[in-house]
């Protein structure tokens, strides 16, 4: 009886892992499609362009 419970739990874990990985694959394709056609790549800027320096330069 214990072995059947163990097998059931392992099958449930494997099914959850497979469902999660297939969802990630679907989202990867969608992101790639949207980035190429609709969005331009914009690098991250730490500070705005008109941000004053923290201390005056000598």
From Swiss-Prot:
Source species taxonomy: Eukaryota, Metazoa, Chordata, Craniata, Vertebrata
Family of the protein in this entry: Belongs to the histatin/statherin family.
Entry GO terms, CC: extracellular region
Keyword annotations from UniProtKB, A to Z: Secreted, Signal
Expressing tissues: Expressed in mammary glands.
Record's signal peptide: 1-19
Record keyword Cytoplasm present: no
Gene encoding the protein: HSTN
Subcellular location: Secreted
Primary localization class, coarse: secreted
Source superkingdom: Eukaryota
The protein, known as: Histatherin
Protein's GO biological process: defense response to bacterium
């Amino acid at each position: 009886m214990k072995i059947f419970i163990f097998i059931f739990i392992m099958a449930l874990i494997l099914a959850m892992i497979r469902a999660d990985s297939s969802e990630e694959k679907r989202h990867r394709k969608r992101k790639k499609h949207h980035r190429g056609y609709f969005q331009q790549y914009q690098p991250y800027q730490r500070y705005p362009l008109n941000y004053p320096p923290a201390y005056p330069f000598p």
